[in-house]
Each structure stands twice: as structure tokens, then as C-alpha cells.
Regions:
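Short, low-complexity disordered leader/linker segments with a strong preference
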Residues: 1-58
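N-terminal secretory/targeting leader peptides
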Residues: 18-23, 40, 48-145, 163-259
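A gly/proline- and charged-residue-enriched helix-loop-helix capping module
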Residues: 145-160
Length: 259
């Protein structure tokens, strides 16, 4: 089936650091600076040791998936647990359905320090750190065990380490499911069926190159515009995981789903 040609979609949560600029090319100082992650850990540890987390803290988390999507529900659970384990000090408001901004904008805002948290696809992170794009390549992992071994190991650590140069801290990788094709009129039964079809993709080199290699016309489009794009015929189909296909209502206008 076509699913063997596709990658597993992985997503990563981010949080802004202290507002410092990206690392430059000047020589390092005599006393090495602590990393953003170390600063966060040291501050949290000191507060926990004193038993006083201070005044209430309020943060915003951007999520492009709709309410009811397991990813969105996971972000809400993250917010609930953060509030619980800090005795009500940390309050994170989750904004689903791209209510604050799209994924690309959320990354820019986290880097600028104007947004606190964002849950984004690794494909969307590729323009900032190339290694994230590699995680979305087809056939990269032979099985789920190999995937998590890489992401929880050196590869994932390298990617998160690079984020610190852009004023961000990676929290964790999050499973979103395998990506599949779905179309409005012509069903896809083999790779040849993709020839000439306009398929919505994310605005990333990996996604565009993959769809073009399969013979289709890659059409970058913001996630929030996909439903209308399918409905009006701007695109013939799209590629995403099944849960997003369902919770975003894309099944209403794209009846053909190829696993």
C-alpha cells in the first residue's frame, strides 16, 4: 500500500527561553555560559527547594489541531499537570485550531519570546534546524522501536541542542500517527494515480520533494486553509494522519482515504 511510501509524522513541543539572541560567531568567554535548558532546570530546582514557586505564572500554548484531536487533548493534559504539580502556580492556556497563529508563525513567535509554548510538526521546524526535516523522511525508521530509540537518544538530543541557538527549548517528541493521502474525486490505488494531481503539503523541502518524487504537484498551503482548498478544488487532495483527517472535517469533502 501507499502507506509504505510515507513517513510517520512526529511533532515537538517548544518553549521560549530567556529572550537572549541566537548564538553569534564571537569567541566564547572565559567562563562558559549555562545553556537555556540548564538555566530553566536550575531556576526550577531552586524554587522547588525553597518550597516557594512565587506568584502565579500565566503562559500561552499554540496548537493548530482542533478541539477533540488527541494531540490537542494531550496539550490540555500537559497544562493541567503543570498546574497540578506547581500547586496552581503555573497556568498554561491552550489555544487550539490555530486560534493564535499558524505553525510557522508560532515558531517565529517562540524564538522572539512573544509566545511561550508551541506544539509543531518536525517538518515545520526543518527551516530552522535541518535535522528535524530528516525525521520526516520516508523509510527512515524500520519500526516503532527504532524510531523511539533514535528520538529518545543521540539524534533527538542533537536536534534539541540546536534549538538553544534560537532561543528555544525542546521538551519532548510526540507521536501523531502515519501520514496518508486522501482525495476528493480520483481515488489513489497505486503510485501512478498521483501523476498530475495537486496535493496539499506543508511548506517544507522534505514534504514538497516527496510528493513531487511520487509524480504529483506539491501545493504548499496553511493547514487552516486545507478544508476550503479541498472543497473548492484548489487542490485534489492532501496528506496527513487519519486523526487529523477526521477531527478537521476533511473527510466531509475528501471521501477517498488511502492507507
Amino acid at each position: 500500500t501507499l502507506a509504505a511510501l510515507l513517513s510517520c509524522a512526529m511533532v515537538v513541543s517548544m518553549t521560549a527561553c530567556d529572550g537572549s539572541k541566537p548564538a553569534g560567531t564571537t569567541a566564547a568567554s572565559a567562563t562558559p555560559e549555562t545553556t537555556a535548558a540548564e538555566r530553566v532546570e536550575e531556576t526550577t530546582a531552586a524554587e522547588a527547594a525553597s518550597g516557594d514557586m512565587g506568584d502565579e505564572l500565566h503562559f500561552k500554548l499554540a496548537e493548530n489541531q482542533a478541539d477533540g484531536n488527541p494531540i490537542t487533548e494531550g496539550m490540555k493534559m500537559f497544562a493541567d499537570l503543570a498546574n497540578k504539580y506547581t500547586d496552581g502556580t503555573v497556568n498554561i492556556d491552550v489555544y487550539p485550531n490555530a486560534a493564535l497563529c499558524d505553525e510557522a508563525s508560532s515558531i517565529d513567535q517562540v524564538m522572539a519570546g512573544t509566545l511561550d509554548f508551541s506544539r509543531v510538526n518536525t517538518n515545520s521546524m526543518a527551516p530552522v534546524v535541518d535535522l528535524f526535516g530528516a525525521f520526516s523522511m520516508p523509510y527512515l525508521f524500520s519500526n516503532t522501536e527504532a524510531k523511539y530509540k533514535a528520538l529518545d537518544g543521540a539524534a533527538g538530543e542533537m536536534a534539541f541542542k540546536e534549538l538553544e541557538n534560537y532561543n528555544m527549548v525542546g521538551l519532548d517528541f510526540y507521536e501523531a500517527g502515519s501520514r496518508n493521502f486522501y482525495t476528493t474525486d480520483k481515488p489513489i490505488t497505486c503510485v501512478a494515480d498521483l501523476k498530475g494531481m495537486k496535493i496539499r503539503v506543508q511548506q517544507t523541502e522534505v514534504a514538497i520533494s516527496m510528493v513531487q518524487a511520487l509524480g504529483a504537484e506539491a501545493t504548499p498551503m496553511d493547514y487552516g486553509e486545507v478544508f476550503q482548498g479541498l472543497q473548492t478544488g484548489i487542490v485534489d487532495g492532501a496528506e496527513n494522519d487519519f486523526v487529523s483527517y477526521y477531527t478537521s472535517g476533511h473527510y466531509e469533502v475528501a471521501k477517498n482515504f488511502t492507507l
